[in-house]
Amino acid sequence: MVKGLVDGPFLVINADDYYGREAFKKIHDYMVNTMDADSDVYDLCMGGFVLSNTLSDNGAVTRGVCQVDDDGILKTVNETYNIRMAENGLLATDEQGNPVTVSPDQPVSMNMWGIPAGFLDELEAGFPEFLDNLKQGDIKSEYLLPRIIDSLVQSKRARVTVLGTPDKWFGVTYKEDKQAVVDAVRALIDAGVYKEKLYSE
């Protein structure tokens, strides 16, 4: 829908999540100053959040747990499920329900990506295959951006720079999360991070 309208790098986020100011600034600066739109591989960047800053007090969460090399380049992003705090640390499972080990300080993707305009061609090219592979009656499968990007990383067709941020992510994963989000936004306003009326003069 946006192909032909977007002529420069752009940011992709989940509309119902709060990511923090530093994460936005880092991705903006990368796209303006560093991103190579003419690279032989897709040059992307990603907000890398600390896992412990993205958990819910009200239940388990799913996160894209990242492996990053010493140069800050993404090696893999693995969807990891049922991440929750327990008495002896974090518990989690893979897609098949097998237990996996995760660390509170691991970087995770919260679906915050800096993307060059040319990447839209890749998304368009892959969509028919996604539709062809759907089973009859399947209305739940999603054309997931993290999986597309991870596939391109593994095939050496994309390079993703992970921009670490200490910002605390928050969103409403469970209805019980709502008050905590309201309180967190209020605290940011009271601290002067944001204005009471965001778009006022």
PLM segments and residue spans:
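Active-site nucleotide-sugar/metal-binding loop of Leloir-type enzymes
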Residues: 1-9
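Short beta-strand-to-loop acidic/aromatic patch adjacent to the donor-nucleotide binding site
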Residues: 9-18
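Conserved core of the sugar-phosphate nucleotidyltransferase
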Residues: 21-112
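Catalytic beta-strand/loop signature of glycosyltransferases that borders the donor
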Residues: 107, 161-167
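Conserved nucleotide-sugar donor-binding
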Residues: 112-123
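A C-terminal functional module that forms or caps the active site or interfaces directly
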Residues: 124-158
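Long, low-complexity C-terminal extensions of enzymes
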Residues: 178-201
